């Protein structure tokens, strides 16, 4: 791996750690916001806020790139919105929308700890989906997936009981997030990441708005009470974190990306501790395992073996 490629990989990994931190801390805002308004309303408003935030950012980046490259640019970057960008945005936006909705309904039936574990099972589903797409997965990444999965079990699962309808919904949520990661990996190689994120949330906003007017009652007072939660989830989680994911995945293997994003569960636990929830020995052990898995996924094992043989 060249120095430039290595630095890009490390920087992209850092961006995903930041995204995971934002997602983990968003659980607090999300929980408080959903005590005031419905699932569709919350998702619609945070998605619209993300669109408002991302539109000027994406326009600024697009105009700067056009000045730097010139009018002779061809391909997907020639126009602000292309057919391929719309297709990618629709696919990403649809999966993000339904994954978020299914997650919220799943939490209603299952405990928070079990919900966190089942949702982050996408780290196991991503390499499995990769097999069906005929992608080679390095053995070390499989080991990392196993370690991280065990770590999240110790970190999140504290309740006892059998499989519930909530568990089934959360497994579906994990699958949808895994699909979204693979879709991003497919399109981000040739599309601008910020614009892809913009279209993604525009689509999510439209879908959730339809559900909001069909299934829920819009209460302006309740929306006002949830304003800070909506702002935090809309700008930081949707606008910034999901965009960091899209941009970072351009330089990362999707399995490695999913492992880093699983840090979300660790930061969620730490955020809970900050707000008065104490970490148990099992949760601390789980945090340690997830960190080990992520660090191990970044180690160039092949290079170390070559050096040792020399």
Question: Which residues are covered by each model-predicted region?
Answer:
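Transmembrane alpha-helical segments that form core, pore/gating elements
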Residues: 28, 40, 50-54, 125-127, ...
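Hydrophobic/aromatic residues within transmembrane alpha-helices
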Residues: 33, 42, 46, 106, ...
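C-terminal transmembrane-helix exit sites in multi-pass transporters
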Residues: 53, 57-58, 122-143, 266-285
């Amino acid at each position: 791996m060249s120095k430039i490629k290595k630095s890009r990989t490390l920087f992209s990994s850092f961006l995903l750690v930041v995204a995971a931190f934002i997602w983990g801390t968003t659980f607090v805002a999300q929980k408080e916001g959903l005590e005031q308004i419905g699932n569709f309303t919350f998702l619609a408003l945070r998605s619209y806020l993300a669109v408002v935030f991302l539109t000027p950012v994406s326009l600024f980046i697009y105009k700067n790139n056009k000045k730097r490259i010139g009018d002779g640019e061809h391909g997907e970057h020639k126009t602000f919105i292309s057919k391929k960008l719309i297709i990618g945005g629709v696919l990403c936006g649809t999966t993000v929308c339904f994954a978020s909705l299914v997650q919220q309904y799943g939490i209603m039936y299952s405990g928070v700890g079990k919900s966190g574990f089942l949702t982050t099972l996408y780290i196991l589903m991503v390499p499995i989906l990769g097999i069906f797409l005929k992608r080679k997965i390095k053995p070390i990444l499989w080991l990392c997936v196993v370690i991280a999965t065990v770590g999240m079990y110790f970190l999140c699962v504290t309740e006892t009981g059998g499989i519930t309808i909530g568990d089934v919904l959360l497994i579906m949520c994990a699958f949808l997030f895994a699909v979204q990661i693979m879709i991003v990996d497919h399109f981000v190689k040739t599309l601008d990441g910020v614009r892809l994120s913009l279209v993604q949330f525009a689509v999510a906003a439209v879908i959730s708005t339809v559900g909001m007017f069909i299934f829920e009652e819009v209460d302006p007072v309740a929306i006002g009470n949830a304003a800070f939660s909506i702002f935090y989830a809309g700008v930081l989680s949707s606008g910034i974190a999901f965009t960091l994911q899209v941009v970072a995945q351009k330089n990362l293997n999707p399995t490695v990306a999913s492992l880093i994003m699983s840090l979300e569960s660790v930061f969620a636990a730490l955020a809970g501790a900050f707000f008065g929830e104490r970490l148990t020995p099992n949760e601390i052990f789980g945090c340690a395992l997830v960190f080990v898995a992520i660090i191990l996924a970044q180690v160039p094992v092949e290079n170390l073996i070559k050096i040792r043989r020399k």
